[in-house]
Amino acid sequence: MSKPRKQQHRKPKGRPISGWLILDKPLDFGSTEAVSKIKWLFNAQKAGHAGTLDPLASGMLPIALGDATKTVPYVMDGRKIYEFTVTWGEQRATDDLEGEVVESSDQRPEEQAIRDILPNYTGVIMQTPPQFSAIKIAGERAYDLARDGETVEIPAREVEIHRLTLLACPDADTAHFEVECGKGTYVRALARDMGRDLGCFGHISELRRTMVAPFGEDMMVPLETLTALEAIEDRDERLEALDAFLIDTAEALSSLPRLIINDDQAHRLKMGNPILLRGRDAPANHPEAYATAQGKLVAIGEIGEGEFRPKRVFG
């Protein structure tokens, strides 16, 4: 009788590289497609993004490589800034240029009328996501149901708009805005609702994301800058040039308290054990904090009862 074969664990393909790449995503390029491209360019074992950006939108798409994928939730929860253009006179099925026209009006809003409604969309508000959205209804994505011709009731939910600014009204048909908002806000829904309030309908005709906290606009790297490096024939030189654009994994955790620890403490944390925090300078209790040793991220954990208990370890 033959012995059962031992299950072989495949070695992951690619490099075990970690860090954040803050991509300036071009138009007509999906978020999943962008992640696949970056993963291939960097020859990374693992990659993921922190917040979908529609193909018809451009701008910031933070992409996590390797261990940085463990910090994605901290970026997903961050504030976001968008610049967008609303075209008045038409409401569309998708609330952007892609969808068919479902309502229209010859009315056009005066600039002062637009300014007058902005306070209604600032602070904590109730917002109904678009029919074409990733919201799940009875286990199915709303956009899948919408594509099948179903109109579904999507419940309104609480979102927070920190700032909504009218930048310009270049003509009667369009208005440019900037919004700083919290997690779960749909800018397309914002355009739809403002159009309804103004009695003229409206949809997004341009959308660009310029910030996903803690990452700023100056950190963005255009895709063409990265793809141009494919011309470097030497593989090691090419990867070194690409790696220069990576941001340290711990940057995503900048809103949390930081502990600087020694190598012995780092070893204990990596084994899943807590470390004692002694002395007057020991930090107060906190549900989440992160620890670094020699500038490298070691763990995310909880501070309580005079110790740091690891929840996630790195490297």
Swiss-Prot record:
Catalytic activity: uridine(55) in tRNA = pseudouridine(55) in tRNA
The protein's enzyme class: isomerase
Annotated CDD domains: PseudoU_synth_EcTruB (cd02573)
Keyword Lipoprotein: no
Source organism, top-level taxon: Bacteria
Transmembrane segments: none
Catalytic residues in the record: D54 (nucleophile)
MF terms in GO: RNA binding; tRNA pseudouridine(55) synthase activity
Pfam families to which the protein is assigned, alphabetical: TruB_C_2 (PF16198), TruB_N (PF01509)
GO BP terms, alphabetized: mRNA pseudouridine synthesis; tRNA pseudouridine synthesis
Key words, A-Z: Isomerase, tRNA processing
Disulfide bond found in the keyword field: no
Enzyme Commission numbers on file: 5.4.99.25
Family listed: Belongs to the pseudouridine synthase TruB family. Type 1 subfamily.
Alphabetical list of HAMAP family matching this protein: TruB_bact
NCBIfam families: TruB
Function: Responsible for synthesis of pseudouridine from uracil-55 in the psi GC loop of transfer RNAs.
Protein name, UniProt field: tRNA pseudouridine synthase B
Lineage: Bacteria, Pseudomonadati, Pseudomonadota, Alphaproteobacteria, Hyphomicrobiales
